[in-house]
A protein has these predicted regions:
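Long, low-complexity, acidic Ser/Pro- and Gly-enriched intrinsically disordered regions
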Residues: 1-98, 108-119
Length: 119
């Protein structure tokens, strides 16, 4: 019997996607800016960058929000993924959401960041 695991529904995947989206945010944003700048050179680039950042951080948070810090499997997944990039992504996300006064998101991310410091 073959067992299939839907990797997209695992905490290790969610943490990896969170980290990847934050790390690659600047690439995504510059691609959006480049695309729209070709269509309309008079477009407000700073506003467009802000929208690109918003899309990236919101999508990254979508994945991170699936983490249940009280679940042992989720804790183990964080332990397996912990590195400088994850810590930086968590810190950057807190700063980003503070700018928009989304303190519930900041508090959730801070719980995960605090958990990483216990490892």
């Amino acid at each position: 019997e073959v067992l299939f695991i839907d990797i997209k529904n695992t905490p290790i995947y969610w943490i990896g996607m969170f980290k990847k989206l934050i790390q690659n945010n600047h690439i995504f944003t510059s691609q959006i800016v480049g695309f729209f700048d070709k269509i309309n050179p008079e477009i407000d680039i700073e506003n467009l960058k802000g929208m690109g950042d918003r899309v990236s951080y919101e999508r990254a948070y979508y994945y991170l929000s699936k983490i249940d810090i009280t679940d042992k499997m989720h804790q183990d997944s964080i332990s397996l993924n912990i590195d400088k990039q994850l810590l930086k992504a968590l810190e950057q996300s807190i700063l980003f959401f503070q700018e928009y006064e989304e303190y519930e998101k900041c508090a959730f991310i801070k719980k995960i960041l605090d958990f990483t410091k216990t490892l």
